Structure formats: C-alpha cells, structure tokens
Amino acid sequence: MALDVKSRAKRYEKLDFLGEGQFATVYKARDKNTNQIVAIKKIKLGHRSEAKDGINRTALREIKLLQELSHPNIIGLLDAFGHKSNISLVFDFMETDLEVIIKDNSLVLTPSHIKAYMLMTLQGLEYLHQHWILHRDLKPNNLLLDENGVLKLADFGLAKSFGSPNRAYTHQVVTRWYRAPELLFGARMYGVGVDMWAVGCILAELLLRVPFLPGDSDLDQLTRIFETLGTPTEEQWPDMCSLPDYVTFKSFPGIPLHHIFSAAGDDLLDLIQGLFLFNPCARITATQALKMKYFSNRPGPTPGCQLPRPNCPVETLKEQSNPALAIKRKRTEALEQGGLPKKLIF
C-alpha cells in the first residue's frame, strides 16, 4: 500500500507553486503517464486534536462529493492519495478564476461575456442541486476557468447533501459578502436559496466590477443588504421574524435595481430580482433561472474560446486592483477561516 502511494505521488512532476492557504498548498504539475497538466492541492490533515477543527472532515467531504460528480462545469477530481499527515487531491488545471477576470481593468466585459459566465455557473449549479448537493461557498474565486474559457465550480470543502426532513445545518457557511440573509439571521434549515443568493451577488459583481455588498460584520452585511434592496416585510418574507438571530432593522426603502444596474435590460433585471428575493422559498432556482428570457434573448453567450483572458499575472491583479477592497476581502476570509491566507487559495 505504501509503495502504491509513493508511486502515485511520483507520477506527478511539480512545475510551479500556485498558492497557499491555511490548510492547503497548491502546485501546478504534470502527469508523467499522460503528459496532462494538473493542479495538486496538498492538504495538511494534522493530528487528531486538529481534526476537531474540521480539517479532516472538510477534505474527506470534498473527495467524497467530487468522486460522485461529473459535469463540464464542475471541477474534475482526477486522483486522491494520502501520505503521512497529508492528503493530495489532483484536479483539472485551471488557468484563472472569475475574480481575476473581474479585477482586470484592461478587460472589457460585454453583455455576451457576462451571459456566458452566468450560463456556465447556473448549469453547474443546476447539476449540483439536481443531485441534492448545496455548494455553500460560491464566490468569484471559486469559479475557475480553463484555457478554453470553460467555467467550473470548485472548492467543495463546505458542500453538503440536503433534502432530509427537519435536518439542521450550520449557518456559518458562504463567505460573508455572498451570504444570504436567512444565514445572516441564523437559519439552521435552508436549501438551494443560499447558493442562488450568492449567484446574484456574483452577477452584480460582474456588472459593477466591484463586490456588491462588502460587509464588515454580519450586522453590517444585513444593513448593506437592506439599505440597497430595501428592508423586507413579513408579507415578503413570512418566517423572517422566527429565525434564531433575527433582529429588527430600520425600514429602508432600497434603491431601484435599474438605478444600480443602469445598463441592464429588463430581462437581466428580472433575473437579478429573482435571485435577490428575500423569501428563500420564493427565490428562483437554477433551473428556473436558466429558463428566463435573459438566456434566450439576444445577444447570445460568447463561446468559451472567445471569452477574455487576463493580461496580468494573477497575484498582481489580486493585490493591486482596488487595494483597500483586496485587503478587506482577505481580512474577511481570513477571519472566517480562522487564520491569514499566505497567497492564493485554490
């Protein structure tokens, strides 16, 4: 068994260091058997005492789920093997991510580009939800793009099967800026709506080229949501007041969506409105979103091979584009993950 693990590890030739997070290091490598370029995510499992932090559970969950999934818009897990206190996951190599594209001010994102990114995101998400899986951590840097412009959902460390009646989940999921209001109010029972709200935030970020609702705390996040979209009433969201962490907010009128997204047509505004419905039971699903007029109306989505590619190194873009927001994003993610990331997080 040990020889098998060692031979599998030797199968991959490391080519470049891609990034490091609190629990994982990512390398670009070449599969010597197939000559395929891959990404290896080396996770530090640690000792049993550290397993209480969920490191082991997160890695095993990601492996288990990805082994069962196969879709053009879901990252492919090619191999997985353990050695000592580490486990290595071998993935499709992806050239960049949506956060890099959004931040590269030298790129012009046309309506057709944005439609293509949203189409691929929703197709991958529809597949997940049809297989009773919530991603629970959708954000631009978890939407990866390969050299052919194909977008794939990645980082399934927080993903979870759903559908069991009366089953409670943790509400401490999804990076705060993309977190649905029901999670911010402490909901323990939730469904696909948490992913759909995150998609709405990603779509808004594609249109505005900056994070839509960059809150500093859960309370500030809710305040930003209500100031922008209006404070929901009990008629709009019947179960709101019964949520564990519900607090009463000032009644904000909100800003009309066509004022925020002034270049968006009615079909796109309808999609945005459906994604940002406060009542999670009324919020549109991925399947419903894909059937909306926005995706059938002109212009059509840009083919993947014609989508823009970043002109600057990834690190330069992530650190130099809007430095204040970049620092704020890193600080927010670090606090939620319990430590400071050293470089890119795969």
Curated annotation (Swiss-Prot):
Kindly name one Pfam family recorded for this protein: Pkinase
- Modified positions (N-acetylalanine) are A2
> E.C. number, please?
2.7.11.22, 2.7.11.23
- Free-text activity regulation comment from the record: Inactivated by phosphorylation. Repressed by roscovitine (seliciclib, CYC202), R547 (Ro-4584820) and SNS-032 (BMS-387032). The association of p53/TP53 to the CAK complex in response to DNA damage reduces kinase activity toward CDK2 and RNA polymerase II repetitive C-terminal domain (CTD), thus stopping cell cycle progression. The inactivation by roscovitine promotes caspase-mediated apoptosis in leukemic cells. Specifically inactivated by THZ1.
Enzyme class comes to: transferase
* Binding site residues for ATP: L18, G19, E20, G21, Q22, F23, A24, T25, V26, K41
Instruction: State what this protein does.
Output: Serine/threonine kinase involved in cell cycle control and in RNA polymerase II-mediated RNA transcription. Cyclin-dependent kinases (CDKs) are activated by the binding to a cyclin and mediate the progression through the cell cycle. Each different complex controls a specific transition between 2 subsequent phases in the cell cycle. Required for both activation and complex formation of CDK1/cyclin-B during G2-M transition, and for activation of CDK2/cyclins during G1-S transition (but not complex formation). CDK7 is the catalytic subunit of the CDK-activating kinase (CAK) complex.
What name does UniProt use for this protein? Cyclin-dependent kinase 7
